[in-house]
């Protein structure tokens, strides 16, 4: 349900940081993130323009969550931003912040990716920085759903798996097992 006070509070935060694309935001003692329709300026060859990326992300998050709860919950949508519930820490930080959780978190991320794929869906770039681990609930949430560029004529789920494993090695995840 629409929350006018939340929208007003989000607009204040955005006005204080007019050029930031992603902003942490606390409202009624709950953590959220505001994601705006602003280019991050990286890899323009491989990424869509900011408006298409925004529309793609909102659509994919809603599509995924209508089937399996593996994307952040969007609680407010505006014409050029949305507010989503915070989902934990990125997997790339888990080794340092919760080393005792590292194996479980990575394993559950793999299970979650397989579950997503079992619904015929794909993420587009499941790098460890785009996968959140909630230390308390032990839940996995995939972030950053705006990537939808196709360079290869392969099943997008295969590319997801390749990028997930590649990210494991790129981040230097400890241990010699997957």
Language-model-detected regions and their locations in the chain:
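Conserved protein kinase catalytic core
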Residues: 41, 91, 150
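Protein kinase-like catalytic core scaffold
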Residues: 32, 70, 82, 139-141
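Conserved hydrophobic alpha-helix
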Residues: 64, 112-116
């Amino acid at each position: 349900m629409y929350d006018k006070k939340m929208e007003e509070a989000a607009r204040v935060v955005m006005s204080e940081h007019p050029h930031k694309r992603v902003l942490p935001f606390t409202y009624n003692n709950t953590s959220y993130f505001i994601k705006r329709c602003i280019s991050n300026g990286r890899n323009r060859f491989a990424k869509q323009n900011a408006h298409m990326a925004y529309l793609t992300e909102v659509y994919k998050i809603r599509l995924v969550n209508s089937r399996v709860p593996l994307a952040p919950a969007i609680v407010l949508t505006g014409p050029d931003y949305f507010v989503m519930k915070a989902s934990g820490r990125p997997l790339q930080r888990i080794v340092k912040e919760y080393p005792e959780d590292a194996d479980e978190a990575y394993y559950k991320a793999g299970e979650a990716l397989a579950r997503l794929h079992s619904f015929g869906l794909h993420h587009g770039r499941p790098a460890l920085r785009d996968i959140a681990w909630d230390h308390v609930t032990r839940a996995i949430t995939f972030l950053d759903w705006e990537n939808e560029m196709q360079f290869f004529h392969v099943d997008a789920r295969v590319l997801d798996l390749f990028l997930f494993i590649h990210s494991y090695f790129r981040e230097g995840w400890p241990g010699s097992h997957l």
